[in-house]
Each structure stands twice: as structure tokens, then as C-alpha cells.
Amino acid sequence: MAPPKKRTAPKDDDFVLTLSDDENDVFSGINEDGDDHLDEETAKSTTKKRKRDTAETTQSKNKKQKQQKQSKNGKQQKKVEEAASEPEEGSEEEEDAGEDDGALNSDFEFDVGAAAQKDVVEGFDGWGLDETKDGAKKNGDKQGVDIDEIISRRQAKKEAQLKKKPKKQEVESEDEGSGNEDDASDGGMSVDFQDDELMAEDGFGMGADGEDESGQSDAQESGSEDEHAGSDSEDSDDDDDDAASDNDSVATPVQHPDDVASDNDGSDIESEVDAEEEAKRKAFFAPEEQTSEQSAAELSKKSFQEFNLSRPILRGLAAVNFTNPTPIQRKTIPVALLGKDIVGSAVTGSGKTAAFVVPILERLLFRPRKVPTSRVAILMPTRELAVQCYNVATKLATYTDITFCQLVGGFSLREQENILKKRPDVIIATPGRFIDHMRNSASFTVDTLEILVLDEADRMLEDGFADELNEILTTIPKSRQTMLFSATMTDSVDKLIRVGLNRPVRLMVDSKKNTSMNLIQEFVRLRPGREDKRLGYLLHLCKEVYTGRVIVFFRQKKEAHRVRIAFGLLGLKAAELHGSMSQEQRIRSVENFREGKVSFLLATDLAARGLDIKGVETVINYEAPQSHEIYLHRVGRTARAGRSGRACTIAAEPDRKVVKAAVKASKAQGAKVASRVVDPAVADRWAQKAKDLEEEINAVLEEEKIEKQLAQAEMQVTRSENMIKHEAEIMSRPKRTWFASEREKILSKKAGAAELNGLDSVKSKKEKVRLSNKDKKRLDDSRQRNEGNIGWKKGKVDRESQKQGKIQKGKKENKKKGKK
């Protein structure tokens, strides 16, 4: 028995305790007997010197073990105290407790609000997270030119030049000024011939327009609101027409040709839905569930807890202050949890993002966790929308272990590849960057995708995205759940069938043409011949009417940039948002507008879809958009989530069709429509100010161009240096591939522009064609002849015709002489 005793001594001294189930007895013995009992045991088996060493080591271990055990014992004691505090009702309760199957009481409700009260975000809009700002700073490679800095620098130069003028010139200028004042006093009043001419041009028309517009304002106050000035003639009755025809001096009102065409188009569109198309829809869509009025009233009182969602999801919803689901969320969440395909549509600002994010998170909570795999792909048409959706999804998943990744253009490819190596659960991307990683990143596989979401699906189904969408759909698995959402969702079966939907459920909460009921729509009419005063109207509205939290939409990036410079010169704080800016600049513009550093956001249709910024009070359309659908998305940036807002459109005669469609849909819905009257003299004054700034605007543009060229030259230098230093590494990288050639890209871009603006816009642009040598020589000869360097040289035909003319002329002269 001696050998076992020798082995037990080192076991007690050198064995290190680990966390396991067998250590509970050891811990309890240590806590009950204390350090003295342990010292006695060690004294029997070790020397005095060893005793000191072991005592020091065991004391440090015992402290940690005691803390762990105390926490466990504390929890157990709490449970015992709670059990002891309950009233004893005899042995029957003990028998019932032993037979408990673990099910929750049906009346039990989670106190989600109190649990997440510390992290509640009031009015969360998907922006302002630190991740977005850090990502923009880290991944923004391009340093843009600061327009405000150029403007301030030029203004400082002008002030310095004025100060450098000698005092003599100042005295002379004062004398000249006094002389001019004397001359002006002789006339009695100053005469501005330019203003006089403008008033003379509009003299008769101005009075008529004013009466029409004042009549409209009276009609607006009485409750009958019109689309814009001039619509009274469209709504006149037959009796008025007969009375007008009886009087020779009054012309019978005639309907505008564009209105006639739009009415005919509308009737044709309504008649297009024939029996064949209806049969297609019945065969393609799943049958819709009929809800009674009582069930609809009950649904409006529902909360998120009644969807049987998991506690982490409910805590995430409470953290962003989502309490009651919106109509689209009430309809979508139960169907999406069943794994069915969905085609959803609701007005702007109704919570469509949360409608598909919440069921996705709920399903991912029950995923297998042994091997990380990417299961969800959410595709967005614009970068800003993808960044916003990423922020919303990560905020809702705060209390879960679900991982996310955003694949957006403008951010670092290397960092995105590193994140993809970890196989995140949800991928939020734009189509172009998604395809780039799909083809060129070895760590990214799409074979495991189970859910595909297309946000703003009607835009994704247009010709501009058709090729990219087809490439994605043919690569990812066909056995998936597909969900499509948009405010203006298409019903065309031919378009939807391309997505590969399997008997989708159609969830149309509102009509496709509806706007928010809290939105007031205004229209400012530009009379024929006053289209060049459009900027004057905009400056008047932004300077005197709508002074803060305004988004101004433009059709062209060039026009938005010029107006941005004009706003800076006039002292209006503005930021721009369009496709010519780097991703860092775009995110910075949105953040500055959101935080109130700037009052105006000048944007193209890039910001028309999905952008959710809290507190936007007004949307101004510098020009009416190309279609009514785009108009709905633009004005949907305000009056979101039950808040009120206002939209103002500056409309001329070419915009008549879109304005009429908007007014017609709003009246059918019962929304507020008004006509805003702007004094032409005020608009002319602001237009003249804008005209005076043209020279300064061009100078700022020229200086900006020079700075961009310098920045580009610096970038080329650094690129060349990197090529020299790291040539072997750069040349060893595999070349990135794309599914389409450059020619196919150009054709796809043209197809998208043709669908948006019409075929005429594409045909009107002159295509750049490479000239042959023969054509170049012909152009050079014509240029030289025009300059007068080389005279015109007769050709063979010209010489022969000239000879024939001389012969015929001689014969005629001989005949005349013979007659004489």
C-alpha cells in the first residue's frame, strides 16, 4: 500500500482544479472548513518550506473559487427564498409542481419595455450609428473638393482687394457717388427700364393670371382645392360652355391637348386589365385571404408580442421604440414566418424594412450553429438604402448572435472579403458589388442562400438592373424564399415571373398611387415663357418660405451642383447628394443634413427611394419627375411614420401630365392638394440675383476643376509609386472578372435610360463615333475653305457644266445677231 500513498501526495499538491461537475464537493469543502482545514491537510504531506509555497498558491485559487461559488450559492439561495416565501397550500400543490410540463402560463407577458429601457432609441431612422461614420472614414479613398472652402477663399480674396485700394480712389469714388445722387435728384425718381419692360410684357397676362390664381386660393379655402392655375377651365360645366358660346366676346374654353392625351391614356390603362391578364394573375399568385371588418379592427390593436416572436427579437424592437406593428407588418410577418414567397406593397414610410427583417431574424434564431453559413441576401438599388437597411437590421438584432455584412460599392474590397470569410448570416448588398464578390471572392459562396429579398423591387426589375438581376438569380439556389417589396409594386406577371417566385402571396396594403394622408402637396405653376425663371422661384421658396429641413430634387447632377454653389454664395447652408460623389462624401452629406449642420439637401433621384431621415419637413421638386411613380417616391421622403410634411413642385407646361396624374390620384385618395401663388416680381428679382452670380459660379467651377485635376495627378503619382514598389504582388493578383462586356454595359445603360426618359431622349443624344481618315480629310478641307486659306477648286463636273454653259450662251448670242 506504500506506492499509492506516495502517488497521492503529489496529486494533492500539483493537481490544478478545473471547472467541471465533480468539483462542487471540493468547493463546498473549501468554503465550509476554511483555509485552516486546508492548511492542516497540506501540513501532513509537505515540509514547512513547501507549506509556505502551497499556502500562497491556494489562497489565490480559493479567492476565485469562493467568488464563483458564492455567485452560484447566491442564485440558489434566491430561488430557495422565493420558494419559501410562497404560501404553503398543502401537498396538492407539491404534486402539481412535480407534474409541471414546463409550459408558460397563457396570461404571461414579457416585460420587454422595462428590460430594454436603457437602450431605447427615440425615432430611430437607420442613420447616425458609429459604424457608419467609422466605415465612411476608413473606406473613403477619394478626398473631394470642398465647395464651401473655395467660396470662402474667393470671398476673402475680394475683401482683401477692396482693403488694398488707396484712400484717394475711395475719395474719388465718394465724389462720383455724390454727383450721381445729384443727377438722380434732378429726375425726381429712378427709372429701371429693365423692370419696366418685364412688366410691359406681362402687363395684360399678369392681371388675368392673378385673378385665376386668387380664384383658386378662394376655392382652396372653401374646401375645393385645384391642381394649379388654369384647371378651372378643365372642370367647367356644360352650362358655362353654352353661356360662353352665346357671347361673341368670350372664347369657349378648350381642353389642353396634353390633358386629352393623358385622359385617353388613363382610360386605355384601365381597359388593359382584361380577362386574360386577370387569369394570369389568378394562376400566378396564391389565393388572398379575405379579412372581415371585425378581424381588421382586432388586428389594428395587435402588438408584436402576439406574433409569438422570440424574446431577443422583442427586446430589439423595444430598443428602437417599435411597439405596434404597421398594416404591412401585420400582414407580412405571419406569412413570412411560414416561408412563403411574398409580393408586398405599401405607401412610403410604412415600415416595409422591418416587415421583412423581423421574420428573417426570427427564423435565423433557430438555425444550426455548428457550421457558420450565409443564409439571407437582401438586395437594394442604391448604396444609401443598403447602408440604412444594414443599420436597422443590426439594431434590431442587438440581443441576438446573428451576424451581418454589407457589400456596397465605395467601401474596401479587402475588408469585405475578410468579413465574408467568417460566413455572416445576412448579406445586405447592391447588385453590382454582390456579383463582384460572387465571381472574384473565393471565400464567398451563394449555394447556401435560403432567403432572397428585393427591396424597391420595381426599380430592380427595370431594364437598367435586368442583366445583373438575371446573373444573380441564375446563380443562387432556386429552392429559396423570395420576398419583393416596394411602394409602387408592379402587378405585371411577365416581370415577376423572371424572379422565380413560387405561388407568391400578394400583400397590397394600399393602392399603388397613394401618398401619406398627412402630406400636403403644393404646385407652383410656371407660365409659358418663364421657364428660365425657375431658379428664381426656388431661391424665393428656400429663402423666405421653407427655410429648414428641406430636400430639393433635381433631374440632373450638373444642375444640382450649380445650385449648390449658388446656395453657398447666397449664404444658404446646403449639401448635395448624387452619383458623382464618393461614398465618403455621400454619407457625410446625409449625416450633416440629419444632424442639422445644413438646412438643404440637394439630391437627384438617387435619394428618392427608401431614404429615411427623421424630421424632413419639406420636399421641393425643382422639376417634375419623369413619371408619377418617381414623384410618389420623392414626396415620400417627408410625412413618414405618421408625421406631417409638405411637398412643393415647380411645374411648367412640359410637366403637365405628371402633375395632372398626381392631382387626380390625390383627389381620389382624399389627400390635400393646393396651389401656391408666387409673386412674379419677387421671382424675377431672385432670378436676376441668380443671373448676376453666373460669372462667380463659373469661376468656382473652374477652380474646382483645377483642384480635381491636381488631386487626380497626385493619385496617379502614388499609384505609379505603388506599382514600382509592389509590382510583383500587384501583378500576381488574379484579374477581376465581370459577366458582361463593355459594349453590353453601354447597351444596358441605354436601355435603362430609354425606359426612364423615353426613346426620344436616347435618340437625341449624338453618339461618339470614331472618324475615318477620309472623313477627317473632308472636315479639314471644309474648315480650311471656311477660313479662306484655300479657294474652292472646280471639279470635273463643274468644269464640263461651265463649258456647256458657255457654248449654249454663244449660240443664243448668234441667234440674236441673226434676227437683227
From Swiss-Prot:
GO CC terms of this entry: cytosol; nucleolus; preribosome, large subunit precursor
PROSITE patterns: DEAD_ATP_HELICASE, HELICASE_ATP_BIND_1, HELICASE_CTER, Q_MOTIF
Domain Helicase C-terminal intervals: 537-714
Sequence ranges of Basic residues compositional bias: 806-820
Subcellular location: Nucleus, Nucleolus
Residues at which ATP binds: A346, V347, T348, G349, S350, G351, K352, T353
Catalytic activity: ATP + H2O = ADP + phosphate + H(+)
Bias type Acidic residues, positions: 83-102, 172-185, 232-245, 260-277
Keywords: ATP-binding, Coiled coil, Helicase, Hydrolase, Nucleotide-binding, Nucleus, Ribosome biogenesis, RNA-binding
Region spans: Disordered: 1-278, 759-820
Keyword ATP-binding: yes
Pfam annotation, one family: Helicase_C
Record motif DEAD box, residues: 455-458
Gene Ontology molecular-function annotations: ATP binding; ATP hydrolysis activity; RNA binding; RNA helicase activity
Placement of sequence motif Q motif: 302-330
Annotated Basic and acidic residues bias: 130-145, 769-786
This enzyme's EC code(s): 3.6.4.13
Swiss-Prot/TrEMBL domain comment: The Q motif is unique to and characteristic of the DEAD box family of RNA helicases and controls ATP binding and hydrolysis.
Described purpose of this protein according to its UniProt entry: ATP-binding RNA helicase involved in ribosome assembly.
Family assignment from sequence similarity: Belongs to the DEAD box helicase family. DDX27/DRS1 subfamily.
Annotated protein name in UniProt: ATP-dependent RNA helicase drs1
